[in-house]
Amino acid sequence: MHYPSKNKVRMLLVAASMFLLAAGGLQNANADVKQENAVNAERVQKGKVLFSENCQVCHQEGGAGKPGVAPSLTNKELLSAASDRFLLDTIRDGRPDTAMPTFGQLLKDEEIQAIVSYLRSFGTEPVKGGMLDNDRKAMGDPRLGARWFSQVCAGCHGVNGEGYEGSGSGTAIGKSGFLGKASDGFIRYIIKNGRSNTPMRGFAGPTGMANLNEQEIDDIITYLRVLQK
């Protein structure tokens, strides 16, 4: 009878040990994923309850929004373009001079994060917020931007971007509460793509409402920054 050499036995034992270690590592990884998913699901459910208690009265069930009252918070464009920081800071600080109050003294940080996790659960596209926040600064002519804003934006957002206070159906994009948190990349993305489930439609390309080109969009953003100042 032929017996395997000591080296072969040693190699077989090493291979078996490596297999058992890999299997154990895979089991641990699967357990970690399951635990993380459970934590995330719990956070989303907590956020849903907090949203119902604090946000739903204006933003409606499921964050669908209502024109003239509060914008949709669960449309795919916003959830793709907005960074977590944008959402967290907006909930915490509110939007001064609008109906959006500050929740920073009412809710704990982890509760605000839970609301953001709940909103994120509606997302259907990759989150580009971080990339957009690092996008180039708008370099435009505010005088031309004022003209474009008057022609294509003021009808909904108000003459000076005052939003609902100007009896418009759009939000107050000319006030510091928005402009202080929104990057040029974020604004550019929303102008191009619009926000579904709201009156805001995309303005770029041949199918856009105004077919604005890159420079014209930058002109509008530059004008908004003048309003911010």
Can you say where each PLM-predicted feature lies in the sequence?
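Extracytoplasmic/secreted proteins, especially bacterial periplasmic and envelope-associated proteins
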Residues: 42, 46, 86, 110, ...
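Residue-level marker of structural boundaries
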Residues: 56, 78, 96, 121-124, ...
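Gly/Gly-Pro-rich "capping" loops immediately C-terminal to redox-active cysteine motifs
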Residues: 37, 41, 48, 60, ...
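The canonical Cys-X-X-Cys-His
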Residues: 47, 51-61, 115, 119, ...
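Axial heme c-ligation environment in periplasmic c-type cytochrome domains
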Residues: 67-74, 90-122, 131-135, 167-172, ...
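Electrostatic cytochrome c docking/interface patches
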Residues: 28-49, 123-148
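Short, solvent-exposed loop/helix junctions and linker helices
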Residues: 41-45, 49-52, 81, 106-109, ...
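N-terminal export/targeting leaders of redox proteins
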Residues: 1-45, 110-113, 117, 121, ...
